[in-house]
Amino acid sequence: MDFFDRLDSIRARWNVLEHPFYQRWSEGRLERDELAFYAGEYRHAVIALADSLSAAAADAADPDSGFDSDEAGQLGEHAAEEAEHVALWEEFAGILGADVDRSPRPETRACSESWTAGRDALEGLVAAFTIESGQPAIARTKLDGLVDRYGFEEGPATEYFSLHADLDHEHAAQSRELIEERLADADLERLLEVAEGVLRGNWELLDGCDRAAGRE
């Protein structure tokens, strides 16, 4: 089983589309205040992805990193895009009246830490790939739920989801190519540890949202 097959097996164990929170989202069974609470929490994860990519880009710019200047520049552009997406998330949070200044729950803080746990450019890339390769399906599920179940119209409040439903196919493909070129000399177990931390962190963030709503 190659690296990406192993990563997919880990993803199957932490498939957030099977989490009760997202299942209720799809079925229209979340209260609006639960959506608002989630929006405030997940904002920290959106920031963490941008921070992780920014750190990876900075590491890749080091001449000893094994990345060339074009690859480092590509990572820098990707990081800048994700930083801009924080504002898109805040459009969604604002429609819900979410408190984006609230301190994150412990589960959310742990998620952010796992998403930024990469110690070098390759580990940061693996973290980003793990997140973004799953995002199209997750973002599409969320978008469909918002429009079909919660009365949202596609527009500024849902742009984060529509963008990630499409754009992350490209981002994940770019990251995968950079990762594949470096696997022969990499510590695969460490990279899979990073990936599992990312996936578990996302799952547990949702656990925290359920606990906050008294569902656990």
What are the residue ranges of the model-derived segments?
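Non-heme di-metal
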Residues: 1-216
